[in-house]
Structures are given as structure tokens and as C-alpha cells.
A protein has these predicted regions:
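Signature of the first transmembrane helix
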Residues: 3-61, 89-99, 120-121, 154-155, ...
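Membrane-water interface segments that mark the loop-to-transmembrane alpha-helix transition
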Residues: 7-19, 45, 50, 54-101, ...
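Transmembrane alpha-helical segments of multi-pass transport proteins
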Residues: 105, 370, 419-434
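Interhelical loop/hinge segments that connect adjacent transmembrane helices in multipass membrane
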Residues: 1-5, 172-179, 192-231, 274, ...
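Hydrophobic alpha-helical transmembrane segments
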Residues: 115, 145-198, 368-373, 387-408
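Alpha-helical transmembrane segments of polytopic membrane transporters and translocases
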Residues: 28, 38-56, 219, 250-268, ...
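Specific pore-lining/lateral-gate transmembrane helices of multi-pass inner-membrane transport
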Residues: 67-84, 253-367
Length: 434
């Protein structure tokens, strides 16, 4: 059993991390083929897609796992979750498509980009429960194959469209059009591959069970909204607060250099995948607090090294990830974004206290506080510092979330962190990175 657990964890890890590595290739392709204005448009719309994915799944994936492991109503849970998401997604598709012109006018984007965005959000929502079903059934290989296949197909289509399609066609519709077209095709292919799961589960709806699942899912939805705002809405605020003629280009250079933080993100994601199951499995061990402290210290040491390494060799990494010099003006933000993501990773490590003590609502509260800070500091700093203000707002937000979790964690579940060692190492990493 343990052997299968480790194998599945490794496979799910690959399915999570490998697509993110592939997106690095997409970033290089986009900044090579798109000007800063077009890349800014793509990045701005993509933020809304992230929020849309959260809203259209409304925490149902987490509720699915919780209720599948709770009782004997497994078939009812499967069919209720699938029916709920299918009906709500198709309803959204109908309403959003009818209002597509109004949405495009309100957001100030081309209508074809908005339509593609609607399709992508709906297609992604329709595969939430099929993917959850695969994980619940232990079909890790198929899960990883479809996840990686989706990203690989998207990458291949992007390479074809932007490199080999007639340049006259790209000039007529814009490169952003073909980026979203590739995403729609890849998402549609994923849905087609997973359609047999729809047949296995069947459509039935149990209202009383659905109400219970929605009550459980609501805090997850709030935390998801907060995450989407914290992670990407600085682009929305940049477009809102900067002059219209320069906003998209500024978002473009900011988003490209922001991608340099992906190395820290990959490290944090891998850490979460590996350590969260361990946190729960060792919660009853009398030495658990000491173990948690040691794990956090190791994480900070490794994260500090990544911060220092990427910052020192930024001039090398920019040639790999951002070969277009037009985007280099925003490289100033790289150490700030790396440090912000390190703070977020430390926050995830510190969050063990409310997970093992069943105070999970605290996570939603901290995320909402972070969202409020994101909004406040973006509005305060962007008019003054432009994209530098957006980067600083991200650092302040994640730093505050980390500090709040540490403060309350020590009150409710004291963990003997070696504060002096952490301060010295983290301080030295920051000092030599700026």
C-alpha cells in the first residue's frame, strides 16, 4: 500500500510540475513572437480565466473528495457533483455567450478573445469532476497522461500557429487569437478523452446532498477567489490605473518578468505535494512539532538558495526565458517576485497548524485578508510606481499572510522554530539578492 502511495504521489507530482515546466517554453515562444502590447492583452485576459475557473468549479472538487470518503453514498456524490457542474457550466455558457458583446465592451477586449475565454472556462469546468474521479479511483497514470497531454497539445499547437502559420493570417487576426484557439482545441480534446467517465457516472441529482456539499465547498470557493485575486489581479489593476495607451504594454513586460518567479513556484509546488500528506500522517506523533520545525527550516534554506541563485544569474536566465529585449525593462521585479513566492511557500509550511488542528476556516480568513491587502496596496502603489508597485504589493501581501499564520500558529499549536537560524539565513539571502 505504501509503495502504491509513493508511486501515485510521484505520478501526480509529475502531472502537476511537468505542465508548468512546459509553460516556460510557451513564455519564451510568446515573448519571441508577440510584442509587449499583445502579450499584455493575453496576460490580462488569462487572469480572468483563472478567476473564472474558480467560480465555475465553486469548490465542488474539494467537496467531491470529502464526501466520497465520508460515507456510503459514493454514487450519489459522483452523480450530484457531475450534474451540478455540468448544468451550471452550460448555463454560464449560454448567458455569457448572449452577453459576449457587453462583456467585451466592459472589459475593453476584442469580442473574439472574450468568446474564446468563455469556451476555455466552460471546457475546463466540465473536466473538473472527471479528473477528480480518476484521482479517487487511483488511476494516476491516466490522470497524468491526460494532464500532460493537454499541455503538450497546447504547446504543439502554439508552436505551429505562431511559427508556421502564414504570417498574413496572424497579422490579420493577431497572435493572441491563435494562442486562445490553441487553448480551446487542447481543452476540447481533453474533454473528449474524458467523456467515457460521464457515461460511467450518469446524471442524477440529489438536492439534500448537494446542499451539504455546497456548504462544505463555500469556504473553498472564497479561498479560491482570494487566491485568484492575490496571484493575478495586479494585471487588472495595472490596466485600470495606468494610461490606456501604455497599460497593455506595461502588463506585457511585467507579466514576462513575473514568469521568472516560476522557479520558486515549481519548488513550492513540489514541496506542497510531498509534505502535506506527511504533515497529516505524522500529526499524532509526539515529536511532530520538532519535525515540522525542521522541515520548515530546510524549506527556507532551499528557497533562500533559489532566491539567491536566480537573482545572481538573472542575466543568464533572461536569455533563456525572455530573449526579447523589449521585455527586459521590468527585470527589476525578479528578486521581489521570488521573495514574495518564497513567503507564500513559508506560509504554506506554517499552515500545518490549522490543518492538523481542524481549523481550516483560518486558511480562508487569511486568504481573504491577503485579498484585501492586494487590492489596497495595488491601488496605493501602482499610480505612484507603476508595475514596481504591483510587485511590491505582492510581496507585502504574501509577507503579511506568512506573518499572520506564524503568529496565530504559535498561539494554538506551538512549533519550536529556530528563529535565529531562520532570520540569519533568510536575511543573508535577501541582502545578497537586492
Amino acid at each position: 500500500m505504501l509503495k502504491k502511495l509513493f508511486q501515485d504521489t510521484a505520478i501526480y507530482g509529475i502531472a502537476t510540475v511537468l505542465p508548468r515546466v512546459m509553460t516556460l517554453l510557451l513564455t519564451r515562444l510568446y515573448v519571441s513572437k508577440l510584442d509587449t502590447n499583445d502579450f499584455g492583452i493575453y496576460s490580462g485576459i488569462f487572469v480572468y480565466l483563472i478567476l473564472g475557473n474558480v467560480l465555475l468549479s465553486y469548490g465542488m472538487e474539494t467537496a467531491f473528495f470529502r464526501f466520497m470518503n465520508k460515507g456510503e453514498q459514493k454514487k450519489q456524490v459522483q452523480s450530484t457533483a457531475l450534474t451540478s457542474l455540468t448544468v451550471s457550466s452550460l448555463f454560464f455558457l449560454l448567458v455569457a455567450y448572449l452577453l459576449r458583446e457587453s462583456i467585451a465592451s466592459w472589459l475593453n477586449y476584442k469580442i473574439e478573445h472574450i468568446v474564446f475565454g468563455i469556451y476555455i472556462m466552460v471546457l475546463d469546468a466540465l473536466v473538473v469532476i472527471p479528473f477528480a474521479w480518476l484521482r479517487n479511483k487511483g488511476k494516476a497514470n491516466l490522470y497524468a497522461f491526460v494532464k500532460v497531454g493537454n499541455t503538450a497539445l497546447n504547446l504543439a499547437l502554439n508552436i505551429y500557429f505562431l511559427n508556421y502559420l502564414y504570417q498574413e493570417r496572424i497579422a490579420a487576426t493577431g497572435g493572441v487569437y491563435y494562442i486562445f484557439l490553441a487553448n480551446v482545441i487542447a481543452s476540447l480534446a481533453t474533454l473528449i478523452v474524458l467523456l467515457p467517465i460521464y457515461i460511467k457516472i450518469r446524471f442524477r441529482f440529489y438536492y439534500s446532498l448537494w446542499k451539504e456539499m455546497m456548504i462544505y465547498a463555500f469556504p473553498v470557493l472564497l479561498a479560491g477567489i482570494a487566491f485568484a485575486v492575490n496571484e493575478g489581479f495586479d494585471r487588472v489593476f495595472l490596466r485600470m490605473l495606468l494610461p490606456e495607451e501604455t497599460a497593455d504594454a506595461t502588463i506585457g513586460i511585467y507579466s514576462a518578468c513575473y514568469k521568472m518567479g516560476v522557479f520558486m513556484n515549481l519548488f513550492v509546488s513540489a514541496f506542497k505535494l510531498g509534505v502535506e500528506p506527511f504533515f497529516f500522517s505524522s500529526a499524532q506523533d509526539k515529536n511532530a512539532p520538532k519535525t515540522y520545525a525542521r522541515i520548515t527550516e530546510y524549506f527556507i534554506v532551499c528557497g533562500g538558495f533559489i532566491l539567491l541563485f536566480i537573482t545572481v544569474f538573472t542575466d543568464v536566465f533572461k536569455l533563456i526565458l525572455i530573449p526579447n529585449k523589449a521585455y527586459w525593462d521590468a527585470l527589476w521585479i525578479v528578486p521581489i517576485i521570488l521573495l514574495a513566492n518564497l513567503c507564500l511557500g513559508i506560509y504554506h509550511s506554517l499552515s500545518v497548524w490549522y490543518k492538523v488542528t481542524d481549523r481550516t476556516s483560518f486558511g480562508a480568513i487569511v486568504s481573504l485578508i491577503g485579498m484585501a491587502l492586494t487590492v489596497f496596496f495595488n491601488f496605493a502603489l501602482i499610480p505612484w510606481l507603476s508595475y514596481k508597485g504591483a510587485a511590491l504589493a505582492t510581496l507585502i501581501t504574501y509577507g503579511a499572510m506568512m506573518s499572520i499564520s506564524y503568529y496565530y500558529g504559535q498561539k494554538h499549536y506551538p512549533i519550536p522554530y529556530n528563529k535565529r537560524k531562520i532570520k540569519v539565513f533568510l536575511g543573508m539571502s535577501i541582502l545578497f539578492s537586492f
